[in-house]
Amino acid sequence: MHANPLSSFNRAQHGNLTNVEASQVKSAGTSSTTNIDSKNIEEHVADRLSDLGRPDGGWFFEKSLGTLKNLNLEQLAGIHDVLKLTDGVKNIVSFGAREGGFELAMQFRHDLYRSQHPDENSPHDAATHYLDAISLQSNKFTKLEKLQHVDVFKMQNPFWDVGYKNGIAHAKKMAFFITPEWLGSDFCKQEFQWLSETKNKDIKSAFVIFKDVDLKSKNMTSIFNFADFHKSRVMMASTPPESGLNNVKIENSVDLNFKRLLTDRESWELNNFLGD
């Protein structure tokens, strides 16, 4: 997601998904070590993490669980599950969750799924179009905590960055919704850094830039330079009064912020890019 290990999202978020999507989210990431000997799981996980490259400052789980050698078998299985889940990522989306960014990403993901699977009952992999708040929801180490006095949960997984980096390593496309909130998030900017550093040289990228972004900022200069060098697609979103996206029904939820919108043409262009 945009991604923040503490991803805020509105109550009954499952309402963003069809029944098929929701059931597959629940089943896609059940922790299992059936295809790897438990005696070798530490070595296997260590090799995979080494190949991904340790982030600046260390893996997120090191802050709460300790180094890889300190992890027990269940925790190692949790990492293995995250890696297995994100090996199938096709597209990955980076967004700032605040000020309507989360709702925009969820709407766009929903429309992208439906364009590829017009039949609501058509099966698909829940992690194909990766938003970490949703795609890691089935992992047993993902925890939800309701924030007091507001209709919002936060989601936390100690292995979120493992999944995100692995998603980038396998994805064919990566799209960024660039907003002031994205630029203000260290997690979002870290995702851009991971794209810059990935060994996946076949990944293509697109940047959807909203009109309230300071185009002359240092961060935007880095993005434009990257996009120019890698021939990324750059779209300037017009932020219309009405969205070209289909509204996603989120039952029993209040105060959703649909500030971030795309026109029909903008939505079609990005959908077409990710759907190739």
UniProtKB/Swiss-Prot annotation:
The keyword Magnesium does not apply. It catalyses: NAD(+) = 3'cADPR + nicotinamide + H(+). Identical genes are encoded on the chromosome (hopAM1-1, AAO54553.1) and on plasmid pDC3000A (hopAM1-2, AAO59032.1). NAD(+) hydrolase (NADase) that cleaves NAD(+) into nicotinamide and 3' cyclic ADP-D-ribose (3'cADPR, v2-cADPR). Upon infiltration of A.thaliana with this bacteria an effector-triggered immunity-like phenotype (ETI-like, cell death with severe chlorosis) is seen, 3'cADPR levels rise while NAD(+) levels remain constant. Plant immune responses are suppressed. Triggers hypersensitive response-like cell death in Nicotiana tabacum cv. Xanthi and N.benthamiana when transiently expressed, depletes NAD(+) in N.benthamiana. Its EC number is 3.2.2.-. This is 3' cyclic ADP-D-ribose synthase HopAM1. Keywords: Host cytoplasm, Hydrolase, NAD, Plasmid, Virulence. Coiled coil: none annotated. Changing E191A: No NAD(+) hydrolase activity, no hypersensitive response in A.thaliana plants, no longer toxic in N.tabacum, N.benthamiana or yeast, no change in plant subcellular location. Changing F177A: No hypersensitive response in A.thaliana plants, no longer toxic in N.tabacum, N.benthamiana or yeast, no change in plant subcellular location. Residues 20-39 are annotated as: Disordered. Disruption phenotype: When both genes are deleted no 3'cADPR is detected in infiltrated A.thaliana, bacteria grow a bit less well in planta, when the genes are deleted individually reduced amounts of 3'cADPR are seen. When both genes are deleted pattern-triggered immunity is slower in infiltrated A.thaliana. GO terms for cellular component: host cell cytosol. InterPro entries: Toll_tir_struct_dom_sf (IPR035897).
